Amino acid sequence: MLTADAHQHYQPDPDVLRGRVIAVTGAGSGVGRAVALAAAAHGAELILIGRTVSRLEEVHSLIAALQRSEASIAPLDLERAIARDYDELAAALQTRYGRLDGLVHSAGLLGSPAPIEHYDVPTWCRVLHVNLTAAFALTQVLLPALRASADASIIFTSAGIARRPRAFWGAYAVSKCGIEALSRTLADELEHSGHVRVNALNPGPVRTRMRAQAFPAEDPSQLLLPEQIVPPYLWLLGPASHGVNGRSLDCQPSGERA
């Protein structure tokens, strides 16, 4: 029987993701990088999606050094990508792998803290596009590959601000509220597919560049490293979470803030 916090205390077997093909956006840094490396260390074959090729190449080299699995790089600038870019990525994935067992959305933009009354419209559009619209577009084109898997998992990275929006969080808060809605809507649509489950994860306070940008006065030494909050991602990507669908979960017990 699954407990409410089973995902937070998950201790995966070394080969829990062996043979699975998993795509991660934002794989060049932060939580996305940590999830990609952890999934590879547990046997998954990775598709590293991100904007900065040099960072993706670094992660690719680290995965190769593990000698546990393989990885491929799929450069994609979510801010500027058009429909053809998504289609080409999906076609290349289908040709090489034939299926997709996991899709982790970790790429994101913070935007600028400002009241709605004065929020910069171009910044608003950029944040909503990268954090929400791009996640929708990529999921849509990859659904056929996910349906080809016997047990596929989609993970949308949410935030505490999605559940309790607060002043001055602007487009970021709205985008994360949208991610929660997108996750639950898609989960309900796929409820009876039997093959694809969809959930959202809130990493909580983590030592990343985005966190430092949002809370410049915060002591980063008091925050967990991205590597320390990946077990819930591995839990949702693997067989231990079979049947878990439409949930919004916290990586940390506090379920805290942004």
Regions from the PLM with identified roles:
Residues 2-7, 192, 196, 200-201, ...:
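C-terminal helical subdomain
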Residues 20, 68-69, 99-101, 146-159, ...:
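Active-site loop of short-chain dehydrogenase/reductase
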Residues 21, 26-30:
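Conserved glycine-rich cofactor-binding loop
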Residues 44-58:
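Conserved glycine-rich Rossmann-like NAD(P)H-binding loop of the short-chain dehydrogenase/reductase
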Residues 66-82:
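Rossmann-fold cofactor-recognition segment
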Residues 89, 114-116, 120-125:
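Substrate-binding pocket helix/loop in short-chain dehydrogenase/reductase
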Residues 147, 151-192, 205:
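Catalytic loop of short-chain dehydrogenase/reductase
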